[in-house]
Amino acid sequence: PMWGINYLTKPKFELPQLQDHVSEGTNTATSIGSYFTTMLDQSMNWKDAERLSSKWGGHFALKGIMSVEDAKKAVDIGCTGIMVSNHGGRQLDGARAPFDQLAEIVDAVGDKIDVICEGGIQRGTHMLKALSVGAKACSGGRLYLYALASAGQEGVEKALGIYRTELERDMKLMGCKSIKELNRSCLLYTSPSPRDTLL
C-alpha cells in the first residue's frame, strides 16, 4: 500500500513539540498497547484530582467515571462535571458501555454535577437516548476526528450538521420541541431496568 511506500521514502513522522518530552513524539516505533500502557499513571489518585480541581479554580470535569461511587467522589472533590466514559472500550473491551450505567449515575449525582455521556455516540439517535436518560451533554472523539482527518474543518462541520439534523428530525418525530422535553418515558427498554438494552 501507498502508506508503506511513503513510510520508507518520505521523511520520518515526528511531533517536534513533543519529542523532548515523550518518546511517542519521535519516530521511535511503539505498539499501541505499549503506548497506552505508558500513558496510564497509576500514581494518580483522588487527592491529586482534588488538588488539580482546586488549583484550576473554574469548571473542572473528570473523564472515565464508570460507577456511582466514583461519581459521588467527583462531587465531593469539587468537580463541576464528569464524563461517563470507558475511553471507547479500547483499554478494557469487556467494560460496561457508558450508557449501561448512565441512568444510575444521573440518579445519584445529576442534580449536583453535569453528567456528560462520552463514548459510543455515533448517531444523533444515540445523543437523543443519552439526553433522554438525563445526560446534560454528549461527547466523543470519533465524532469529529474521522471527519477532521478526512476533510478538515469542513468535514467536522458536515459531521456535526448530520448529528444535529438527525437529532432534530427524530425529536420532531417524537413530538418533542425542546431538549428539556426529553426524559426516560421517551425510551422503551426490553425490561424495566434502564440499564438494560434498548429496543
Name each model feature, range by range.
Residues 81, 94-102:
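Second-shell residues forming the walls of enzyme active-site clefts
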Residues 100-191:
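Alpha/beta catalytic cores of nucleotide-metabolism and tRNA/nucleoside-modifying enzymes
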Residues 86-93, 148:
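Glycine-rich, proline-tolerant flexible connector loops at the mouths of alpha/beta enzymes
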Residues 56-58, 76-81, 109-112, 134-137:
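Glycine-enriched alpha-helix->loop->beta-strand junction motifs that scaffold or abut catalytic
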Residues 1-76, 88-91, 100:
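Active-site entrance/lid segments in N-terminal catalytic domains of soluble metabolic enzymes
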Residues 63-65, 84-87, 116-118, 140-141:
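Generic beta-strand/beta-sheet core signal
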Residues 189-199:
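Single conserved hydrophobic/aromatic residue that forms the stacking wall/gate
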